[in-house]
Amino acid sequence: MDKIKIVDLEVFANHGVFEEEQKLGQKFLVDAVLYTSTRVAGKKDNLEESINYGDIAARITKFLQENTFQLIEAAAEKLAEDLLLYTKGLEQLTLEIKKPWAPVGLPLKTVSVEITRGWHEAYIAFGSNMGEKMGYIQ
């Protein structure tokens, strides 16, 4: 499966457990790996056949700025759900939300959460291979 990557998208948003984090806001960095097929887009040289990473970056920014979460785990989960439902051709994604200004009182580069979510095929079958087969269906 092919990948389109967005690395270190900087978003200023209001997420965190502490009241000050939700009032003042802080910087978050988002990495997104979008799993899709780029074959047709590559052969036709046509953006309509691919996932527009500019649109995805704008959607991530808007989503994180318009919603408030206490945990970056919750932000990642809801953002993944939104992107999967919105994005045509997106089969799976890996999101990492980094919180470089995390208020832990110790020197660190960043704290982050990384999740992978995607679509799964499900099959529904009717009937049985035992007994009165047509009777079960009817």
Question: Whereabouts are the PLM-identified features?
Answer:
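N-terminal, polar/charged subdomain of small-to-medium soluble alpha/beta proteins
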Residues: 1-124, 128
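Nucleotide and nucleotide-moiety/phosphate-recognizing core
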Residues: 121-124, 133-138
